[in-house]
C-alpha cells in the first residue's frame, strides 16, 4: 500500500515484493515524465492527446495517488510556467476547461450511483474556476460521497438559502485567494452541518482563523484537496 501511495504501479509492486528492492527514485522519475507529457499536451492545446494521457493513468492508479503525484504537482509547475510564458492565458483556459469537463462528467456518473445528502462545494473566490475545488470534489466522489459543485461565489444570504434547500451533509468553501475579513466570517457561520474551508485561503488567513475556529467547533480547515479528503474522512462524512 505504501508503494501504491508513492505512485508505483500494481505490476511494479509485484516485482518489488519478489525482489525486496525499493523503486521510489524510479517512481519519482516516472511521475516527472508523466507530468511532462501532460504539459506538452497543454502547451499544444491538444485535448485529445491530453485526454488519452490522463485516461491511461486513470486506468493504473487510484484518484488519491493521481492527485498527489500527478495533478497537484502539475498545477504547481504550470503556475510557475504561466508567470512568464507567452500564451499562458490560453493554456490556462484550455486546461481548466478540460479539467472541469473531465471531472464534472465523472461526478455526474458517480452521483447517479450514490444516495444520501451531498457534500456541497462552493468556489468563494473571485476566480471563475478553481481547479483545486474540482480535485477535492473528485476525491470525495471517488470515495463514495455524492457531491454538488457551485463554481461561482454566492452572496451569504443566497448561500444560506442554497444550504437550506440542498440540506448537505457538509459545506466545503474553497478559495485560492484572500477574502475580505468581514465576508469571511459571514461565510463561515450559521450552518446546521459541518463546514470546511479549503485552499490557500487557509494559509493566507492563518492567524485570523485561529480565533474563528476556537469559537466554531463545526469548522475544519484544509490547505489542499488531499488535506480536505483526510478531514472529510476523519469527520466520517464520506459515506452515506
Stretch-by-stretch model annotation:
Residues 1-111:
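Long amphipathic alpha-helical segments
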Residues 94-240:
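C-terminal regulatory/effector modules of DNA-binding transcriptional regulators
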Amino acid at each position: 500500500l505504501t508503494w501504491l501511495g508513492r505512485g508505483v504501479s500494481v505490476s511494479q509492486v509485484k516485482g518489488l515484493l519478489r525482489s525486496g528492492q525499493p523503486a521510489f527514485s524510479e517512481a519519482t522519475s516516472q511521475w516527472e515524465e508523466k507530468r511532462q507529457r501532460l504539459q506538452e499536451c497543454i502547451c499544444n492545446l491538444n485535448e485529445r492527446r491530453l485526454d488519452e494521457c490522463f485516461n491511461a493513468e486513470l486506468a493504473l492508479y487510484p484518484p488519491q495517488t493521481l492527485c498527489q503525484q500527478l495533478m497537484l504537482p502539475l498545477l504547481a509547475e504550470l503556475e510557475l510556467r504561466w508567470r512568464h510564458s507567452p500564451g499562458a492565458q490560453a493554456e490556462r483556459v484550455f486546461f481548466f476547461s478540460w479539467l472541469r469537463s473531465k471531472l464534472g462528467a465523472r461526478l455526474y456518473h458517480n452521483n447517479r450511483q450514490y444516495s444520501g445528502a451531498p457534500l456541497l462545494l462552493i468556489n468563494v473566490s473571485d476566480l471563475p474556476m478553481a481547479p483545486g475545488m474540482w480535485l477535492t470534489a473528485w476525491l470525495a466522489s471517488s470515495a463514495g460521497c455524492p457531491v454538488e459543485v457551485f463554481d461561482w461565489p454566492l452572496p451569504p444570504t443566497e448561500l444560506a438559502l442554497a444550504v437550506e434547500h440542498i440540506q448537505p451533509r457538509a459545506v466545503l468553501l474553497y478559495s485560492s485567494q484572500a477574502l475580505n475579513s468581514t465576508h469571511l466570517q459571514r461565510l463561515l457561520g450559521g450552518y446546521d452541518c459541518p463546514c470546511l474551508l479549503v485552499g490557500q485561503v487557509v494559509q493566507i488567513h492563518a492567524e485570523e482563523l485561529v480565533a474563528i475556529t476556537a469559537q466554531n467547533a463545526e469548522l475544519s480547515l484544509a490547505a489542499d484537496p488531499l488535506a480536505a479528503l483526510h478531514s472529510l474522512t476523519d469527520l466520517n462524512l464520506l459515506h452515506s
